Regions:
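Nucleotide/phosphate-binding catalytic cleft detector across ATP-hydrolyzing
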Residues: 1-143
């Protein structure tokens, strides 16, 4: 399955969804599972507020976690199986495209696969087969 994701500073955008690029971590299950990602024994509410603008989006795991949430939302919208293989199409700003391309690909495609998590209480098991990177704004058109 091909999924285009725009990792913006303000919002994460896919073909069917747009939600704020903020994330809040909890050590316990929040009062609602709406927009909640469970990963690595922690809970993350996705789309809450905004995170500070980072010069390097790979500085922490926030954009990776938001990517998992975006993939889960797209899988749910498309009625696809929650255990599947995914190719991500993502954009990078032109200014850092050549410099960040390899590291952003590795950031979005971990060496430990498949990736298991829960989103809104639903278990997912994904194999991220490939990450295709394009100049920002082009990924939606390319895949």
């Amino acid at each position: 399955m091909n999924i285009g994701i725009d990792h913006g500073y303000y919002a994460i955008k896919t073909r069917h969804f747009s939600f704020p690029a903020g994330i809040t971590a909890y050590s316990h299950e929040p009062y609602t599972l709406q927009n909640t990602l469970e990963y690595g024994g922690k809970f993350f509410v996705c789309g809450t507020g905004r995170q500070p603008i980072l010069r390097n989006k790979m500085e922490n795991e926030n954009y990776y976690l938001l990517t998992l949430a975006a993939i889960a939302k797209e899988i749910q919208q498309r009625g696809a199986k929650t255990e599947c293989s995914v190719t991500i199409a993502a954009g990078l700003p032109l200014a850092g495209f050549g410099r960040e391309k390899k590291s952003f690909r590795e950031y979005l495609r971990p060496s430990s696969q498949p990736v298991s998590f829960k989103f809104e209480g639903v278990p997912y098991k994904l194999t991220i087969e490939d990450v295709k990177l394009f100049p920002q704004g082009y990924s939606a058109l390319m895949i």
